[in-house]
Amino acid sequence: MTGASGVEGTRIPLHSLSCRPSAGRSAGSFVNTGIMEAFRGTRPGCLPVWFMRQAGRSLPEYRAVRGTNTLLEACLNPDLACEITLQPVRRYSVDAAILFSDIVVPLKLAGVGVDILPGTGPVLNNPIDTPDRVNTLLAKTADSIDFGIIAEITRHTVSVLNGIPLIGFAGAPYTLACYMVEGGPSKTHMKARAMMHGDKKTWQKVMMLAARLSGQFLAAQITSGAQAVQIFDSWAGSLSRKDYVDNVAPFSKMTIDLACGIDGNSDLSKTGKSLWPRVPVLHFAANAGHLLTAIRDIGVSVMSVDYTKPLDEASELLDDSMPLQGNIDPAMLFAPWEVLKRHVLDIVQRASRAPSHVLNLGHGVPPDASCDQLARIVDLAHSMV
C-alpha cells in the first residue's frame, strides 16, 4: 500500500498532514481551520483542496482493502468505511476527508431492495413508482429510520482524523428520486420527469420521501461530528430552470432543513433555528450552470461548480458573494502535467472573484485517473499563498 509519501507500505500519521510549509502555516493550524475558513467565505493562508470521489475506485489501496465485499457492504462496515475514507487523506494530504458512502445507502437502511452493480450503478429490485410503495416508505420515515450505523461510522472516522475535517455526504432528492422511479440509472430520466408533470401528487410524495431519507442521513452525520456536508445532484442538469424551481428546489431545501435540525416538529425548529450547530452545506449539480442562482436560494453555503461553467462566470451569476468549489475538468487529469497545471492556474485565477475558493474537480475522480497527477495538484494548491 502506498502512503502520501509515495513509499510502499508507508502511512503518514494523520496529525502531520497539513498545508505545505511554503504557506508558512504550522502543521495543525491549516488542517483544523483552513478549509473550514474557505467554506465560510474567508481565504486561508493557502488554497484548500480535496477531490470528489477521492476515496474508492481510483486508489489501489482501496481495491486491496475492499476485497470481496460489495460496495454497499463496504459503506456499512464501520472499520472498512473509515479506512477507505482515510486512504486519500494519507496518500494526497488533501485538506478534508469525505465520508465513503453512496446516495442509495438511506434506501438500503429503509429496507428497500437495492444493489450497486459494477459498471451499471444502483439498481432497485422494484421501482418506487406507485402511491402504495411510496406511502409505505413514507410511513417508515415519519418514525425515523435507524441511522445508527451511519452515526457509528462517522464518530469512528472523526476520532481518527485528528482534526482534519470530515465532510458528510448525501444525494439530493431529485437524483435519489430518479433512481427510485426509474429503478436504476437512466440517461434521460424520462419516467421521473413524466411523473413530475403527469402525476404531481405521487411525484411530490416521492420527493418528500427522498428529502426525508437524505435529510435524516445527513443529520446522523452532522450530529456525529461531520464538520460540513455536500449534497450531490448528479441529474439536476436534465431539468429546466422552471422545473427545478417548481418541482425540485422546495424538497432540496427540506433536505437541508432536516440535516440542520429544522424539521417543524419542535417549537425551536419551527422558528427556523437549528436544533444543533449548523455546518457549511456544499452543493454539487452536474451540467447545471443554468440553475446556480436557484440552487443558491435553497440555502447552500458553498457552490461546487461542474467543469462546464467557468468560475468567473459562476461567481458573477452569484453576485461575487458565494464561496466556490471546483472545477478541474477530470479529462485534464490525463493531459501532460504542464497542460494540467495551466488549467488549474486558470481556474484559480477565475475563482479570484469569489470570497473564497476550494480547489476540486468539476466532477468525480475517474476510476483510471493517475494518483500522481492528483498529488501534483495538491502540491500546487498548497504552494499558493
UniProtKB/Swiss-Prot annotation:
It is found in: Cytoplasm. GO terms for molecular function: uroporphyrinogen decarboxylase activity. GO terms for cellular component: cytosol. The record marks D102 as: Transition state stabilizer. Pfam families: URO-D. Pathway: Porphyrin-containing compound metabolism; protoporphyrin-IX biosynthesis; coproporphyrinogen-III from 5-aminolevulinate: step 4/4. CDD domains: URO-D. Belongs to the uroporphyrinogen decarboxylase family. Catalyzes the decarboxylation of four acetate groups of uroporphyrinogen-III to yield coproporphyrinogen-III. Homodimer. This is Uroporphyrinogen decarboxylase.
